[in-house]
Amino acid sequence: MELITELFDEDTTLPITNLYPKKKIPQIFSVHVDDAIEQPGFRLCTYTSGGDTNRDLKMGDKMMHIVPFTLTAKGSIAKLKGLGPSPINYINSVFTVAMQTMRQYKIDACMLRILKSKTAGQARQIQVIADRLIRSRSGGRYVLLKELWDYDKKYAYILIHRKNVSLEDIPGVPEISTELFTKVESKVGDVYINKDTGAQVTKNEAIAASIAQENDKRSDQAVIVKVKISRRAIAQSQSLESSRFETPMFQKFEASAAELNKPADAPLISDSNELTVISTSGFALENALSSVTAGMAFREASIIPEDKESIINAEIKNKALERLRKESITSIKTLETIASIVDDTLEKYKGAWFERNINKHSHLNQDAANELVQNSWNAIKTKIIRRELRGYALTAGWSLHPIVENKDSSKYTPAQKRGIREYVGSGYVDINNALLGLYNPDERTSILTASDIEKAIDNLDSAFKNGERLPKGITLYRSQRMLPSIYEAMVKNRVFYFRNFVSTSLYPNIFGTWMTDSSIGVLPDEKRLSVSIDKTDEGLVNSSDNLVGIGWVITGADKVNVVLPGGSLAPSNEMEVILPRGLMVKVNKITDASYNDGTVKTNNKLIQAEVMTTEELTESVIYDGDHLMETGELVTMTGDIEDRVDFASFVSSNVKQKVESSLGIIASCIDIANMPYKFVQG
């Protein structure tokens, strides 16, 4: 035990998220432990009687209870399942918050009760560590009631109290039980006799036994029932990296993020009409389709003879023109249609190609030869579809370039322009790292100083408030690499929270032009599944990359104020649209985009998501904890009416989008390999 105590670093606290920030006294938290999908948390509360009746902390309360719980991947609160791989760091983090709360709100006593079975055999070490923390951090003002440590075999108790206040005088601390002890006056003061054993005990021992007697009867379930939590805060807690630096700057901007995601009140961008017209222009579509030279790719792969190259090109172009009139040239539907047409055309020539190639393997048995040739065909098809979508996406996106290049930025103030330039230049890494909690002020490896970063974020926030609005129907694209644990939480929760400013592009930059190649993800399902790796769409793929590559397709950006730099403020070739920090998106569709083209095995996903404003989020909900623990189903408490909450619609949206079954092809063409970092960071 001494060894563990000495090795313990009392400065090692884990990231903590306030799950109900509207409360004047913060009192419900999640603790981010490594990269687990389910995270431990805790609630601060007080009891109004000797039973299970509990309530939120209020000003003037003198006794506080800490009740541990588990925050599930779906965003619900359940009984504690465990403290993660490092129970000691959890306790350190919990008591850091507890001590701050006690000092700030003048609370005299605080108690944690935890099942010993959930401490990974470290119950005593946890008590010792708590004692050390209190002694080192309270300056001698608080002490532990050590007489409570060994009272109970089931629970580990830790009770802290103000040193100069008698425990029996603190409201909320039970009186010494007359069932357990007899009080006897003596020359040295009051002494207590244990009624069962007849032994004399100290006053602290009698108080400890009385506290344990009262609290042993209480259930954590009673505390979990009717707990209020913020949906935004849940998404925040589940988008955390495994470590972060909660500097005052991080806390400042975390608290104000929701303000930037109110419904858009800015005017439409100055070239709104031109953007809409070009996006749906037949001429722009025809020009972009001219870049689809699948005939050449077919010929180079020995699928067709040279004299059929121009015929194939014309066939694909005509079919696409017929099916895509009036459709936005950069929409996911357009890319999906093109990928599907290329794939259908490939299938027409598969039989002859297959026969020619299988004859080359006459030395193999039939099954082995078929498998070998089929794998070769899948690799060829994957490369061709990726190539054609890459060419189309680049040409279609470039049609919008004049709008960005000639963008008028006169509406922004000099300070706002400076903030935008710093972000779109080399400062975006430092700015977003500070917002993500990855900026370490003690390690100067950045370009900007802490004060420069804070000023830049303030200027950018101001630019968003003075920003502009996109017309409806514009699709934005972005790539991202994500920890598997965060990805899995997003899959279950169906929402994702961006702490940082979100760099997106007007053109489909995720299809081979930069980073995560998602092309296979837009194939029709029955065809995509023959070449993609994960057949369940939302699972994880074993690849050389331990991160999940995400190709974001984001709609609904017209709902919030945005910044479209362009002109003199940003490189126009990126066609960047910056979305506000603190953005939440609802995940409408996840399509597997993994592929194996013979040289690379990827772990990519194509995700269609929709921007949600603060008004589309119900920030706090009261959940029926009894029903949750009995059935696993989340039910909200609204007086006498119970509303069932479907986690697939965890955030409410009035927009119902039809999900096309043929989306699969395009997902596999996501390409993350060479994209600028700001389109990936987050």
From Swiss-Prot:
Keyword flag Transferase: yes
Keywords from the named record: Glycosyltransferase, NAD, Nucleotidyltransferase, Transferase, Virion
Residue positions of the active site: R478, S503, E576
GO biological process terms, semicolon-separated: regulation of viral transcription
Pfam families registered for this protein in UniProt: ADPrib_exo_Tox
Top-level taxon in the UniProt lineage: Viruses
Thermal properties of activity per the entry: Optimum temperature is 20 degrees Celsius.
Single GO cellular component term: extracellular region
Reaction equations catalysed: L-arginyl-[protein] + NAD(+) = N(omega)-(ADP-D-ribosyl)-L-arginyl-[protein] + nicotinamide + H(+)
Top EC class of this enzyme: transferase
SUPFAM superfamilies, alphabetized: ADP-ribosylation (SSF56399)
Record-marked site positions (Cleavage): E6, L7, E619, S620
Domain TR mART core: 383-614
Molecular-function GO terms, alphabetical: NAD+-protein-arginine ADP-ribosyltransferase activity; nucleotidyltransferase activity
EC number(s) reported in the record: 2.4.2.31
Subcellular compartments: Virion
Record-linked CDD domains: VIP2
Matches recorded under InterPro entries: ADP-ribosyltransferase, Phage_T4_Alt-like
Description of post-translational modifications: Proteolytic cleavages at the N- and C-termini by the prohead core protein protease give rise to the mature enzyme.
Role this protein plays: ADP-ribosyltransferase that efficiently ADP-ribosylates one of the two alpha subunits of host RNA polymerase RPOA on an arginine located in the C-terminal region. ADP-ribosylation of RPOA alpha subunit enhances the transcription of viral early genes. Also ribosylates RPOA subunits beta, beta' and sigma 70 and performs an autoribosylation reaction. Additional in-vitro identified targets include proteins involved in either translation or cellular metabolism such as elongation factor-Tu or GroeL. Mono-ADP-ribosylates host MAZF which may inactivate the latter.
Family: Belongs to the Tevenvirinae NAD(+)--arginine ADP-ribosyltransferase family.
Protein name in the entry: NAD(+)--arginine ADP-ribosyltransferase
